[in-house]
Amino acid sequence: MLFSRRLMLGLAMAGTLASALAFPARAAEGPTEIDLFFPVPVDGKLARDMGTLIKEFNDGHPDIKATAVYTGSYDDTLIKTRASIKAGKPPAAVIMSANFLLDMQIENELTNLDSLIAADGSTKEKFLGQFFPALQGNAVIDRSVYGVPFHNSTPLLYINADKAKEAGLDPSKPPQTWAELTDWAKKLTKREGDKVTQWGIAIPCAYDYCGWMMETLTMTNGGRYYNEEFGGEVYYDTPSMLGALTWWNDLVSKYKVHPPGATPGPAVSTSFISGNAAMMMLSTGSLTYVRENAKFNYKVAFIPRNVRNAVPIGGASLIIPAGVEADKQKAAWTLIKWMTSPEKSAWWSRATGYFAPNMAAYKTPDMIDFLNKNPDAKTAVEQLDVAKPWFATYKTVPVRKNLEDEVMLVLNGKKQPKEALVAAQKAADETLKPYNAETSLKLP
């Protein structure tokens, strides 16, 4: 019996060893595979830059295999992320438009990152202290961290310095006010009879960009686009927004220094690079494109003010959607911390034009050298002193489109500004009604 038991034990141990050799522990089976949703078309420089970044991460983290999945625009990425959550197969991480986080949190579609921060032995305050204060408004909801700033932007004024000099203007002293910008645009607009051969200024207006530019102009006119403390209120039918939209429309229809109609962002940047527009308002994220493609000297400057200097934050944060499995969540958190480290944040900024959200990025030797050679990259960082959170509400996209649809009608000459803003406010209030019914209007 003893022999038999020893024999059986030996066989069992041998079997266990064989199993261990044939089926090693999970860590040895292979890396944890995670997807990262990235809002960009499949082709293009941003996709290549992200591919470089992800390859470097994978090479340095053999226990994780990250794959960048290119998901189109910010709006498209939100739609695809929500569909994947609903299907029970969310990506482990998403580069999500920073102003979508509130709506996602309301819908229970985000992972609260507080516990992951605590597991690292850190605190919310210490963790967020790495990033520029202006970015925290879109990352923190109800005192909890839901997003980590990654590639962020502000709008900038781009000026063709050569054309400015030709018009007798000094590009080293860019326009500071709406009045000065209007004067510059008049002087920079060229005509041959009734035909405009060079526009003074171009401002983008297509879904997403249009709302961001309206927020920008409203802020510089002293106003607030939305209630930063509550997701159920927007301020469309106000004097500050009326003044902003009226001035934008005046550039188009009264002064005729701006292309007619609503112009998408890519068309605006192409117009500037080709010399068809002497100035443009566009994202910091376009800076590398301008730097690499402009065949002329250019200048970037703060967005001019009417009442005050102010701009909204733009760009995206890294999030972990709700429903991600524990092992993938841990891997995603490792990826997020790596991507937002000073060194990688600095690299991404140099590659793309987005400013680095991690303040320590600007103390890295490579970034110091880069800024010495490319002082134009400093402007967006300097403008952060007057930056404010990006418009974020319940149903952010529909509420934004309630305004954008009306602004496009104005710029296309089909409505007057006041009429359009009254309609936008009415539509937005209707969109926000369900949220208000369950919050501010739900009384004891």
Show the residue positions of the predicted features.
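Glycine-centered hinge/linker elements that transmit conformational signals in sensory
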Residues: T182-T189, E229-G261
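Extracytoplasmic "Venus flytrap"/periplasmic binding protein-like
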Residues: E29, T52-F131, E166-G168, K173-Q176, ...
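Short, solvent-exposed loop/beta-turn-alpha elements that line the ligand-binding surface or hinge
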Residues: D114-F131, P174, E192-D194, W199-C205, ...
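Hinge/lid segment of periplasmic solute-binding proteins
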Residues: A98-L156, C210-M213, L217, K299-A301, ...
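Extracytoplasmic/periplasmic solute-binding protein
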Residues: N138-F150, P155, A179-E233, A277
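Conserved C-terminal helix/tail region of periplasmic/extracytoplasmic solute-binding proteins
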Residues: G30, K165, P171, S253-K256, ...
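Extracytoplasmic/periplasmic substrate-recognition and gating elements
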Residues: T32, D59, K163-A167, L242, ...
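Long, aromatic- and glycine/proline-rich binding clefts that accommodate carbohydrate-like moieties
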Residues: G129-Q130, Y298-A301, R350-D405, L409, ...
